[in-house]
């Protein structure tokens, strides 16, 4: 299988439409560009033209939000086929997906919903990730989620769950530092101790982002600057 193809240290950004002019005209010194896979499932048009321009200048990371790896529904064949076609066209350095579910009964909820960290969930995800990797002919990264509920029947921590999933499938991890911090504050655990449950060799990419502070909890909104505690946690990672 094709591994991830970035240097050991590369700093990139999430490419959005407001960035196009600066990226294409000034060519800033970036290690890579990350885009949401689903925004480029059409074979042509302005979006695909922009992505091909980006790919000509930088390595690209395809980050999925809609494969719904943990859904009780079967894996969406049409979605996976579109992703495969995009991967073959763009030849990205990294392919990643959120570790979540986002639909059931054929209805897509347009959200990234958490999963119970149980052996049953682990077996389901291992099979799904194995199929995706076989179909794409490459390893993928899976990303830890921000969550606002905990399941009573969970029998392992999220990071222990991620570590075992990587061991079983050979997939890598996209470690979202902000998501880990948000969950640590909301559920009252030590995020540094959780980092110790992950093998550094399994982490293929990290995300840094901001969150919103409310009276009740932290919400992962990507709507503010990265805060000092998240930077400190990144230093620990």
What are these regions (language model features)?
Residues 22-28, 45-62, 78-93, 130-135, ...:
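Acidic (Asp/Glu)-rich catalytic clusters
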Residues 20, 37-49, 68-78, 148-156, ...:
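Acidic-and-aromatic substrate-binding clefts and catalytic sites of carbohydrate-active enzymes
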């Amino acid at each position: 299988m094709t591994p991830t193809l970035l240097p050991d240290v590369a700093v990139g950004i999430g490419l959005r439409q407001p960035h196009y002019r600066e990226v294409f005209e000034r060519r800033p010194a970036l290690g890579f560009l990350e885009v949401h896979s689903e925004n480029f499932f059409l074979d042509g048009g302005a979006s695909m033209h922009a992505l091909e321009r980006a790919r000509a200048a930088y390595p690209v990371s395809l980050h999925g939000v809609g494969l719904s790896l943990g859904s009780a529904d079967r894996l969406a064949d049409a979605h996976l086929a579109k992703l495969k076609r995009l991967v073959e066209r763009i030849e990205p350095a990294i392919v990643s997906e959120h570790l979540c579910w986002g639909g059931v009964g054929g209805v897509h909820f347009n959200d990234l919903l958490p999963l119970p960290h149980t052996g049953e969930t682990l077996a389901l995800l291992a099979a799904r990730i194995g199929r995706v990797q076989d179909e794409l002919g490459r390893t993928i990264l899976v990303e830890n989620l921000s969550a606002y509920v905990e399941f009573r029947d969970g029998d392992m921590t999220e990071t222990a769950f991620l570590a075992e999933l990587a061991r079983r499938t050979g997939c890598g991890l996209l470690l979202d530092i902000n998501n880990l911090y948000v969950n640590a504050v909301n559920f009252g655990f030590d995020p540094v101790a959780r980092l110790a449950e992950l093998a550094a060799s399994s982490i293929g990419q990290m995300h840094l982002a901001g969150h919103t502070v409310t009276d009740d909890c932290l919400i992962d909104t990507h709507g503010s600057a990265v805060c000092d505690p998240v930077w400190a946690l990144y230093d620990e990672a």
